[in-house]
């Protein structure tokens, strides 16, 4: 069965290709009465859209979202919310020379073997263009979560060899890299300019944080909250790794260092990333995701054609030298969608659960 839908109670279904006429989404399960405007979604879409700096693809898409259903007089009705974003700046001729070739490290080869047919224009369905609808749907989830005191934010924590320490949220929206350290921005710009001259690409690491999440979200065993987050974040194009909390650094930690001790004043650390036993602990939920270097580069690479003959491939078109630069709002959206779904699932089963133990304050 095709995997175009995510969620159990809050579901998001997307459709559309990179060079098709439009992208569409159906968002179902949103409670009625939520105040929702185009601006609520457009704000995040503008953070993701291409062509916003010299360091991203120069494809010019306005990414203007249209609401087709599910909203009346500025409020959600409880019915399915239909969304549409029209593609306006396709240049399909850029891909005519490679329609019978497989671009290295792309989905061309695997889509061909799975379906026997593929839209070669910009990668078709496998293109990161699809994530625009995730961001629109995620904005709805973020709007509802905010009414519950939950905030989801992200930032770039590494670009290539440059590690970016967290300094302030105020810096994140003030530069094209979503860098939380303004002092790192000049180095990032210099690195990206050199990368473009080298006709190469690079990967990145994104950190996304949810604050205000109450204890109890997550459905053991198979739908543990961390498992669901890993699933959702790994579904983003180019993501090759996900960590929750300390992640792989846990390997070198001792138990006395890793365990998050509890006191009446709160947890003493957050190596678990806000999730214990697959259930939210009330601490900030922290996830990191690694994105591979962009596969579309102008440096020639070896491959084969559809008949199995060796060829040399030079990818033309307009591409991001680092897909991670625009990935922060996408990661935020997917975390918000997961939390929204699990909030509704928890409420459906455990709305009457009450315990005397106080909820510990967040760090």
Swiss-Prot record:
Protein family per UniProt: Belongs to the chorismate synthase family.
Molecular functions per Gene Ontology: chorismate synthase activity; FMN binding
Classification via SUPFAM superfamilies: Chorismate synthase, AroC
NCBIfam families, per the entry: aroC, PRK05382.1
Superkingdom assignment: Bacteria
Descriptive protein name: Chorismate synthase
Recorded metabolic or biological pathway in which this protein acts: Metabolic intermediate biosynthesis; chorismate biosynthesis; chorismate from D-erythrose 4-phosphate and phosphoenolpyruvate: step 7/7
GO cellular component: cytosol
UniProt entry keywords in alphabetical sequence: Amino-acid biosynthesis, Aromatic amino acid biosynthesis, FAD, Flavoprotein, FMN, Lyase, NADP
Binding site for FMN: 125-127, 237-238, 277, 292-296, 318
InterPro entries cross-referenced by the UniProt entry: Chorismate_synth, Chorismate_synth_AroC_sf, Chorismate_synthase_CS
Cofactor(s) it depends on: FMNH2
Complex formation: Homotetramer.
Record-linked CDD domains: Chorismate_synthase (cd07304)
Documented EC number(s): 4.2.3.5
Cofactor note: Reduced FMN (FMNH(2)).
General function of this protein: This reaction introduces a second double bond into the aromatic ring system.
Catalytic activity field: 5-O-(1-carboxyvinyl)-3-phosphoshikimate = chorismate + phosphate
Gene Ontology BP annotations: amino acid biosynthetic process; aromatic amino acid family biosynthetic process; chorismate biosynthetic process
Pfam families with a match to the protein in the record: Chorismate_synt
Binding site for NADP(+): 48, 54
